[in-house]
Curated annotation (Swiss-Prot):
Subcellular location: Mitochondrion
Pfam families: AMP-binding, AMP-binding_C
Modified residues (N6-acetyllysine): K179, K182, K340, K398, K510, K544, K570
Name of the coding gene: ACSF2
Protein name in UniProt: Medium-chain acyl-CoA ligase ACSF2, mitochondrial
Family under the similarity heading: Belongs to the ATP-dependent AMP-binding enzyme family.
Binding site for ATP: T263, S264, G265, T266, T267, G268, S269, P270, K271, D493, R508, K599
GO molecular function terms attached to this record: ATP binding; long-chain fatty acid-CoA ligase activity; medium-chain fatty acid-CoA ligase activity
The reaction(s) this protein catalyses: a medium-chain fatty acid + ATP + CoA = a medium-chain fatty acyl-CoA + AMP + diphosphate; octanoate + ATP + CoA = octanoyl-CoA + AMP + diphosphate
Role of this protein: Acyl-CoA synthases catalyze the initial reaction in fatty acid metabolism, by forming a thioester with CoA. Has some preference toward medium-chain substrates. Plays a role in adipocyte differentiation.
InterPro entries membership: AMP-bd_C, AMP-bd_C_sf, AMP-binding_CS, AMP-dep_synth/lig_dom
Residues of the transit peptide: 1-41
Swiss-Prot/TrEMBL keywords: Acetylation, ATP-binding, Fatty acid metabolism, Ligase, Lipid metabolism, Mitochondrion, Nucleotide-binding, Transit peptide
Chain positions found as N6-succinyllysine: K182, K478, K544, K570, K599
């Protein structure tokens, strides 16, 4: 047997749906294309081991395909784990004083799933979960999957117009939320676009602006026109409804859509990336394998998750990965709080910690950081946006996370496609986002020539494999723009790949600055500015300029207590970077515009700077 790199394809049948771009079977690239691209044949022996390094000097790599992918649904995975480790702690929600074993969680999920069906929801209906991290969020994530209902992850910070947009976009039939969190009055926000809810019969809502929405469920307070979540769960507790749920399981497929994750909106209007059981189960399972969770003892499987569950990293690498490996998921607070994360590590003997770079910066900067017992920590995941090398080193050394893994992915890819191995060196973790994940292909394309880029040459990163979404819900044209005929997803990220297969994200193709014909990648300059001893964080954007087209603007956040000047920063650049890369504008800031998941919205930052500079 002989196959070539690029021909190992994973065919998958995706359930047809009115919102998804038809059936998605992964297609093989022709052997002629492979030869034209300089890709050589592999022996069967090579196929059996990990194929994680580029061949022929070109930026293409394929992950290991030795182990089979998992064809179970989320519900089947929960059942397997509950049978294997029934008495192990599954979920701890510190701010709600919730503790459940896997057996208890399975029982509650079954009742909630049965309850959702009992109130008239059906397989394929969309249910929006709108709120901060909570027990109810985890319950709805798993119960919808068990019932065949598609969970719509709604940003908890959304206001009326944003909420209306996403509910209409996917045709939500049900919406679940708490009454209030901090200043966010969820019920009152809904009333702005759905005033009919106040006088509606619970479960029989008829709304002019939201014609698909019939059922509103309140998590924690009786509200006019709504059902209480406890009532829904109680309704599903009868033997009749539980038997019906069991009967319905035979009609669920791992290729059914399970979750609509709206992209973060860092570049414009959010799009509803639609993911299947197959996407989510396998991505979480493969990431756990990369983290070597199968080698850990129960005491070493205690995951602190400060990331929002509405985001793909939280729901897949958090909830689902813990479910797959029998790990304990610990929610420290409703939204990220650095102090609460440290308290959770200390109190719950946490071993793994997730976070974005911004979250880790805040954790490290806690005034009483040294007072917490973090001796049980051993690893974790940092993802969401590029992390400077100095931050990686600080996390490993100060938080005791020697097995830290830098992960890269996109919502459209379920999400993780690149990650380090725990044993990779600090330098490798500081300078790249790791190596390709199993059952995943990556290539970097020369954006001008449309061919495979040579190694160590920037180009647009493309991904193919089981992990690619079913499509953007209700937007076939945007799906076609993102996923080409050969099933490659074009990420929009500019990246390089070295001889060992390590990938480095250079920036967004839309973020690339073109100054007088010179291509400038913000990530390169951001890495450089992080070497300045007074700089805490920096973001580089392009701002409009009549003469040069664009000029460089560095938005710098200084370390606490530090002071410097524009002149000193520019002097620091001279002789170290090319003259055309020295920013024309240096602006000192105290914060950046962020999505709720902690990603920096560069398009908003660019707009702010252009206003600030009167451009």
């Amino acid at each position: 047997m002989a196959v070539y790199v690029g021909m190992l394809r994973l065919g998958r049948l995706c359930a047809g749906s009115s919102g998804v771009l038809g059936a998605r079977a992964a297609l093989s690239r022709s052997w002629q294309e492979a030869r034209l691209q300089g890709v050589r044949f592999l022996s069967s022996r090579e196929v059996d081991r990990m194929v994680s390094t580029p061949i022929g000097g070109l930026s293409y790599v394929q992950g290991c395909t030795k182990k089979h992918l998992n064809s179970k649904t989320v519900g089947q995975c929960l059942e397997t784990t509950a049978q294997r480790v029934p008495e192990r702690e599954a979920l701890v929600v510190l701010h709600e004083d919730v503790r459940l074993t896997f057996a208890q969680l399975k029982e509650e999920v079954d009742k909630a799933a049965s309850g959702l069906l009992s109130i008239g929801l059906c397989k394929g209906d969309r249910l929006g979960m709108w709120g901060p991290n909570s027990y109810a969020w985890v319950l709805m994530q798993l119960a919808t999957a068990q019932a065949g209902i598609i969970l719509v992850s709604v940003n908890p910070a959304y206001q009326a117009m944003e909420l209306e947009y996403v509910l209409k976009k996917v045709g939500c039939k049900a919406l679940v939320f708490p009454k209030q969190f901090k200043t966010q009055q969820y019920y009152n926000v809904l009333k702005q676009i759905c005033p009919e809810v106040e006088n509606a019969q619970p479960g029989a809502l008829k709304s002019q602006r939201l014609p698909d929405l019939t059922t509103v469920i309140s998590v924690d307070a009786p509200l006019p026109g709504t059902l209480l979540l406890d009532e829904v769960v109680a309704a599903g507790s009868t033997r009749q409804h539980l038997d019906q749920l069991q009967y319905n399981q035979q009609f669920l497929s791992c290729h059914d859509p399970i979750n609509i994750q709206f992209t973060s909106g860092t570049t414009g209007s959010p799009k509803g990336a639609t993911l299947s059981h197959y996407n989510i189960v396998n991505n979480s399972n493969i990431l756990g394998e990369r983290l070597k969770l199968h080698e850990k003892t129960p005491e070493q499987l205690r995951m602190i998750l400060p990331n929002p569950l509405y985001h793909c990293l939280g729901s897949v690498a958090g909830t689902m990965m813990c479910l797959m490996y029998g790990a304990t998921l610990i929610l420290a607070s409703p939204i990220f709080n650095g102090k609460k994360a440290l308290e959770a590590i200390s109190r719950e003997r946490g071993t793994f910690l997730y976070g974005t770079p911004t979250m880790f910066v805040d954790i490290l900067n806690q005034p009483d950081f040294s007072s917490y017992d973090i001796s049980t920590m051993c690893g974790g995941v940092i993802a969401g946006s590029p992390a400077p090398p100095e931050l990686i080193r600080a996390i490993i050394n100060k938080i005791n996370m020697k097995d830290l893994v830098v992960a890269y992915g996109t919502t459209e890819n379920s999400p993780v496609t690149f990650a380090h191995f725990p044993e990779d060196t600090v330098e490798q973790k500081a300078e790249s986002v790791g190596r390709i994940m199993p059952h995943t292909e990556a290539r970097i394309m020369n954006m001008e020539a449309g061919t495979l880029a040579k190694l160590n040459t920037p180009g647009e990163l493309c991904i193919r494999g089981y992990c690619v979404m079913l499509g953007y819900w209700g937007e076939p044209q945007k799906t076609e723009e993102a996923v080409d005929q050969d099933k490659w997803y074009w990420t929009g990220d500019v990246a390089t790949m070295n001889e060992q297969g390590f990938c480095k994200i250079v920036g967004r193709s839309k973020d690339m600055i073109i100054r007088g014909g010179e291509n400038i990648y913000p990530a390169e300059l951001e890495d450089f500015f992080h070497t300045h001893p007074k700089v805490q964080e920096v973001q580089v954007v392009g701002v409009k300029d009549d003469r040069m087209g664009e000029e460089i603007c560095a938005c710098i956040r200084l370390k606490d207590g530090e002071e410097t000047t524009v002149e000193e920063i520019k002097a620091f650049c001279k002789g170290k970077i090319s003259h055309f890369k020295i920013p024309k504008y240096i602006v000192f800031v105290t914060n950046y515009p962020l999505t709720i998941s902690g990603k920096i919205q560069k398009f908003k930052l660019r707009e702010q700077m252009e206003r600030h500079l009167n451009l």
